[in-house]
Amino acid sequence: MDKTYADTVRLLLTVAPDVFANDIFAIKGGTGINLFGQNMPRLSIDIDVVYLPWQLPRDEALRAINQELAAIGERVQPLGLQTRRICAKDLGETKLIVENETSQVKVEVNVVFRGTVLPVEHRPLCAKASDLFGVEFELPILAQDELYAGKLVAALDRQHPRDLFDVWQLYESGGITDGMVECFVVYLAGHNRPTPEVLLGNDKDLAAEYDRAFVGMTELPCSLETLLEARARLRQELPRRLTAAQKQFLCGLARAVPDWFLLQCRHAAEMPALRWKLSNLETFRKRRPSDFSAQAALLEAGLNRV
């Protein structure tokens, strides 16, 4: 593993307990998978977090997120670290950069997908990371099915080699569960891009990103061809794994008339990301009805083919 990446993980593990000192955040994404869910098959250099109180109104939630990021900055200052907060348009401060002389870690809150599908768990740092970096602690983390659901959406959407590596490792360790698929449907429904573009979209060229931002991160060798095979398998498998109820829900949402009772998550209709998605679809239907219908038909046709 590359020393620069390892130094970044060391910084990440230094600040992680302060990031989760209060009970409003839980860890998600690659750091949750590789440092807590698995035994560090690859390094992970960012802290992606979910804001847990999904019932709060948007403005109140954003204020709480901004305040907690500021508090984290204050908590890590005695460690001799520098921090700066990054503002996003109309959202306030949603990212915190933590730096020392050699490394930088980004703490980023998903301000749209607030709340969780499943109850949060607490897990210890994996044994390999604990031994290598000499620390032990546990953090609040998304449940395994939900942790991978977000990763599956990311792997189809941005298609970063890191995401596809995590998918490959998932296949190596047992594969996609029905619970992951159910959570995946919720995360796909709350995603900012149109559902057919994510689920049935085009493949990106990964070669440059593989060399620039992936090589040196993994414990095991992993070729570009391996990642491409994992992506192809994922694209083929996920649409076929959807149940009739899940397909019906996604098609109903695409026409802005979702049947929420088709989902196992009883509070899905109240989750901010899904409410926002439905609101945007209703606006899309009013302003561009032909494009709206075409997008829904594209999803229906794609799901009917599998």
Predicted regions and their residues:
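Compositionally biased terminal segments of proteins
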Residues: 1-306
